Amino acid sequence: MKSHRFVPTVAPLTLALLGLATFHASAARPHRQYVPDTAHSISTSWGLVQQPTLPTQVCATLKAALMPVGGSLDTLDQNPAHSKRDTARLQAAIDDCPASSAVHLVPGDAGESGLLTGPLTIKSGVTLWIDRGVTLFGSRNPLDYDNGLGTCGTATSDKTKSCKPLIHVTDTAKSAIVGAGKIDGRGGSTLTAGPNAGTASWWDLAYLNVTKGLSQHVPRLLQIDDSTDFTLYDITLENSANFHVTTDNVVGLTAWGIKILAPSLVYSRPGYHCPAGSTPDVNPHATCFTPETAKNTDGFDPGQSKNVLLTYSYIATGDDGVAIKAHASSKRSIASENMLFTYNQFYYTHGFSLGSETDSGMRHIAVRGLSIDGFNSNDVHTDPYSANGLRIKSDGTRGGQVYDISFENICMRGVARPLVFDANYANAAVRSKLPSFSGITLTNVHSLGSKAFGGGELSFYGYRDAKTTLPIGISLDNVVLEGGKVSFAKRHFGGPASNPGATHFTFKGGPVSFFDQLTESASNDVQLQGKPGPGVQLQCNDAFIAYHSVLPDSPI
């Protein structure tokens, strides 16, 4: 069988970001021999990563049998007995597939494009290949996902997780999900079974955390655990009920050319202009959603993992675009390290985040060539931590060492809080795991400002309590925030007396637009080393591209 090498069209955004980048050899120190990035290879600290290719060996080809209406299967699975009609044949094909082969999902003979499934498990060495035009839809029957606790599809005061993910990858090596098709979690579709059948969607349940303080029990889209060398390539992940991609103890993850979106046009309107009274903040059974009301739909969340690459990808969700976690459990403590994020575009998100769980350590993480278009969105009334650009967050209950973190060649616009470095993210009476941020570097960062928020609000807020001060160590070189003077977040949760506080700044010679608003303070442990100088701000004219030009069912 001949090799299928699909080379996606490189969008103007990625070409622009590739062109403006000042290349470094790797995401982590010590550097490997310098090898320049190209459109088909990325240099990392763990080696040169080549653009993935489509499989050459196919063990089974499965044809889609369902015809979606307007991108939805809701008219076809109203009966909960029909909620997972393709699960058995999909799982059987995966289980019977030998390593180094793929299960290939293709359109039906009459143009059918949909498959409907409950939870699936990917076998070690096996690739799930979803062809262009094909969508794998997740069930909207909570009983299909329940892990035995009986509360999947509800919102309760108990935070114990009760739903299996739609796709689970565990104890695998060299497995993958590839192809130009889609996986749709159907977060905005009305549930068909359980106590909320006919009255709420997954996202309606998630919004009860805002209105009633309850914990939603809903499935993640893709969970990858205890695995090595997993690949996501060219796939679109949409409308997850919760996080789209999460990992735990993964060594080697390449995500290349993926697109993540929540909500899509199936659950919204162009420009996210929902009709009055249709969203879950005012209607408990919503008919339209915005990013602000599709809660906890994080895009890409690598946790306790290393050798992670996300490149040439697009993310618009109702929460963090990327959220890196590093949390020690009772069984093990695994750092998040050696991660590289290059040539990516964010839209509506809560930004690029590290934390708040940092207690098992984070190190050697680089973000390069990132564009963030915040659309002047600010969900401050229901989530004061939304609308960020670059963020590192932790607190005294889940903190650890965070060091060697670099942000380079970053363009932003319409972002309320462009820079947030906060070691006092939450309050707690007992503080036994203290956060320490050091070796943080910002180089060539340019925010074009916001019509709604001007220059935006910043936080440089290191850890301080009655006994301990752990200052942030951060260097700035050519960091320009337009839109007028910036403001600084108010002091909070018993941290330093003012913001900036407990922060040691180093200026590397390039311009820093807010330098004149910084003042040294011995009592507040603010130090300024060096001075900014003249320089040319990073050119961001070509750094933003409409998402619908890349993914047609995007509302923006």
Q: Where do the PLM segments sit?
A:
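Extracellular beta-rich repeat passengers
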Residues: N378-I556
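An acidic- and aromatic-residue-enriched active-site/binding cleft used to recognize and process polar
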Residues: G108-A110, L120, G125, G133, ...
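Right-handed parallel beta-helix
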Residues: R132-G133, A173-K182, T228-E238, V251-L265, ...
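Extracellular "leader-to-stem" segments immediately downstream of a signal peptide or signal-anchor
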Residues: K2-T127, R132-D226, Y233, N242, ...
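Solvent-exposed loop and beta-edge segments used for protein-protein assembly and interaction
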Residues: K84, C97-A99, I122, D171, ...
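Extracellular beta-strand/beta-solenoid scaffold signature
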Residues: T117, D144-I167, L191-L222, N239-F243, ...
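Asp-box/BNR beta-propeller blade signature and adjacent active/binding-site loops
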Residues: K84-T87, Q91, K325, S329, ...
